[in-house]
Amino acid sequence: MSGQQGMGDGFLTTTLDAITNWGRANSIWPMPMGLSCCAIEMMAMAGPRYDIARFGAEVFRFSPRQSDLMIVAGTVTYKMATVVKKIWDQMPEPKWCIAMGACSSSGGMFRSYPVVQGIDQFLPVDVYVPGCPPRPDAVIHAVMEIQEKIKRQKDSFQDSFLAEDDAPQVRQPESPKEKEKLTVSE
């Protein structure tokens, strides 16, 4: 864990952010959006030969409310893009996205009017995995890149509870008459 400092026998100090990021990075819950042939390679990644369980991402969640990583695998049409975006919006923060394969990254070989030429037109993509279809070890490498990105996050855990948008707003009176109205209580 980054940010750790030893303090002698049996003591270890760290920050709350470092321990939170360590937990998030080692317990990723992916949600597969298998739309094409890349989904077959994604299923192979979860099998015993590649063993994605080593990286804490063995449990695929098919509910967006229980996942924090969306793996979009395959061709996305404009009609399907609205569905993918709605599912993305249902995922809790923090969340990450992997564009798996040439079709989800850039439209692939389907350069026609109904196909979205890259899901980065409507989703923030964290890692692109090249290939048609990409091998399972390439997807595992992408999961490892997501883990490193999570570990490097700098946003403060405490600041998320004290965001300026949530702070109580105090309005100051503008005129003496308005000040009287605010001080009189009946």
Curated annotation (Swiss-Prot):
Subunit structure: NDH-1 is composed of 14 different subunits. Subunits NuoB, C, D, E, F, and G constitute the peripheral sector of the complex.
Function: NDH-1 shuttles electrons from NADH, via FMN and iron-sulfur (Fe-S) centers, to quinones in the respiratory chain. The immediate electron acceptor for the enzyme in this species is believed to be a menaquinone. Couples the redox reaction to proton translocation (for every two electrons transferred, four hydrogen ions are translocated across the cytoplasmic membrane), and thus conserves the redox energy in a proton gradient.
Cofactor: [4Fe-4S] cluster
Annotated stretches, region: Disordered: 157-186
Membrane among keywords: yes
Membrane topology label: Peripheral membrane protein
MF (Gene Ontology): 4 iron, 4 sulfur cluster binding; iron ion binding; NADH dehydrogenase (ubiquinone) activity; NADH:ubiquinone reductase (non-electrogenic) activity; quinone binding
Chief location bin: membrane
Catalytic activity: a quinone + NADH + 5 H(+)(in) = a quinol + NAD(+) + 4 H(+)(out)
Superkingdom field: Bacteria
Gene that specifies this protein: nuoB1
Organism whose genome encodes this protein: Chloroherpeton thalassium (strain ATCC 35110 / GB-78)
Protein known as: NADH-quinone oxidoreductase subunit B 1
GO cellular component: plasma membrane; respiratory chain complex I
GO biological process, one term: aerobic respiration
